[in-house]
Structure formats: structure tokens, C-alpha cells
């Protein structure tokens, strides 16, 4: 996707955990609870000054002793509390003009039934073998197999090309990478507590930071 394309205003949040809710028909739906409270605008970027339109948002809170002077000055200029996360969302110029520095964007930015993309950092698993990391099959348990039960097998060829090709699936670090779940449906919104209940799972551990934005690959309903 073109990085200059307007993706719409989103929210920063925290993954509270998972639970389930019931529909009016009695169906059980697994949902992830996201805390999106106190999203405050720290800067409005305009085409005249910055070359593009965007809204910069801060989330969370951080002790003053843990904020460097540059960040403290930036938040003080906006008149808001320094946060743990700072991110900007590309929006249309008309949408950016509707906000001003210091505004708080509420969960009502979204609506029930809307499709969103949620980005988070997956849980780190440490150093992992090829079976866990790439779902390789293990070798024979017995019948002639000696100490080669979980080996990945050959990783190269012969004298030509005489090297291991880049991208070869091998052992290594698993997890702790940014991943985005696309087209998740908002099942419920708690306006009082500023919570979004999103259908399905979201990357990351409890209390992990997430980015919620309007879906960019919305699928059309069949027959529509």
C-alpha cells in the first residue's frame, strides 16, 4: 500500500485480555477487550507545513522523571500529559481540520459492526527450533534413527552454488514482531470505560500496546 494514502483516524490502546459475550440469539462470541481511553492530540500536521495531513496522538502516562527534555517540551507545547506511545495517523485535510491540539479522541470514533485493523507485538517465544518455528515434521522416533529426531535436514546443495540461500527456514528467534490482524469486527463499545470489544484474537500479551485503525481491505458482502 502507498504510504501516502489516507488510512483514516485511528486510536492507540492497551490489550486488556479476552472474554466472551453473548448475542441476542444466545451465540457465544470470543472478543478481545481493548482500552482506548485518553487518546489526546499532540500535533496536527498540514500539507503547507509538513507536506502531508496527519494527526499525532499520545496514549498512556509516564512519570515526568522518565521523559526526556525533547519529549517533555513537545507534550508541554500541546498542553497534554506525556504518554508512553506517540503515533500519527494519515488523514484527509478536512478530517485533520476538525481536530485541534489537546483534544481527546473517544472510543465513539468507531461504531459497532465496523471492521478495523489491529496491530500489536506478538508474544516472544525466544530461540526456537524449526518444528515450533516453521511447523517442520519431526523425523522417525525409532527404526534406524539415531539422534536425528528433530533435525531440520539439509540446508544447502552441492559445491554449486556452495552456499545457503537467503530466507532458508532455520532455527532462530520466534515472536516479538509487529503483526496486524485485519478486518476484525467491533462487537461492542463501552463508552463509559472507553473500551472496544473486538471479535476474535489480537496479537500480543495482556497489557500490550495496540493500534486500532479503520480496515483498509474491507471485504464486500456476498450478494451486495
Swiss-Prot record:
Listed GO cellular component terms? cytosolic large ribosomal subunit
Please indicate if the UniProt record lists Disulfide bond as a keyword. no
Q: Which residues carry this modification: N5-methylglutamine?
A: 159
Cross-referenced InterPro entries, in alphabetical order?
Ribosomal_uL3, Ribosomal_uL3_bac/org-type, Ribosomal_uL3_CS, Transl_B-barrel_sf
One Pfam entry for this protein is Ribosomal_L3
In terms of SUPFAM superfamilies, this protein maps to:
Translation proteins (SSF50447)
PTM text: Methylated by PrmB.
Superkingdom, natural source: Bacteria
Per the record's keyword annotation, is rRNA-binding included, yes or no?
A: yes
Disulfide bonding pattern of the chain: none
Which Gene Ontology MF annotations are present?
rRNA binding; structural constituent of ribosome
Keywords, A to Z, come to: Methylation, Ribonucleoprotein, Ribosomal protein, RNA-binding, rRNA-binding
Family membership noted in the UniProt record: Belongs to the universal ribosomal protein uL3 family.
Entry function? One of the primary rRNA binding proteins, it binds directly near the 3'-end of the 23S rRNA, where it nucleates assembly of the 50S subunit.
PANTHER family with a match to the protein in the record: 50S RIBOSOMAL PROTEIN L3 (PTHR11229), LARGE RIBOSOMAL SUBUNIT PROTEIN UL3C (PTHR11229:SF16)
Q: How does it assemble?
A: Part of the 50S ribosomal subunit. Forms a cluster with proteins L14 and L19.
Q: What is this protein called?
A: Large ribosomal subunit protein uL3
